[in-house]
């Protein structure tokens, strides 16, 4: 899992001139990003309890079942990390229609 996530992040980094802007909608995937020493790529996270120190300045995009889509879009992410159940199907479809890359 970590290897796949790293490959996705590296692919995005290679395809873009700047570092990819990543929003994580799954706390477990957020932890993996931190473990991979890539917390600086995170521009938004889903609140799910106490935050690691590495995320103190990263904006929230909502809570489970209460995704703030307007705030998420204002962060202009290149990639959104999520578990299939972390976002309601209607919101996931909306993100897909907007052309934001999703990894689940």
Predicted stretch roles:
Residues 87, 92-104:
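Flexible loop/hinge segments that line or gate small-molecule binding clefts
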Residues 17-18, 95:
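Nucleotide-sugar donor-binding and catalytic loop/hinge architecture
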Residues 7-10:
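Small-residue packing motifs within transmembrane alpha-helices
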Residues 12-14:
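N-terminal signal peptide c-region/cleavage motif recognized by signal peptidases
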Residues 1-5:
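Positively charged n-region of N-terminal signal peptides that target proteins for export
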Residues 20-92:
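A short, structured surface patch at a secondary-structure boundary
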């Amino acid at each position: 899992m970590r290897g796949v996530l790293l490959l996705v992040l590296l692919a995005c980094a290679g395809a873009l001139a700047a570092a990819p802007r990543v929003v994580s909608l799954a706390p477990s995937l957020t932890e993996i990003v931190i473990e991979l020493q890539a917390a600086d790529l995170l521009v938004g996270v889903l609140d799910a309890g106490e935050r690691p120190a590495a995320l103190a300045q990263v904006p929230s995009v909502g809570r489970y079942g209460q995704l703030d889509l307007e705030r998420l879009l204002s962060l202009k992410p290149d990639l959104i990390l999520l578990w299939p159940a972390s976002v309601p199907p209607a919101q996931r479809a909306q993100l897909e229609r907007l052309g934001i890359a999703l990894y689940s």
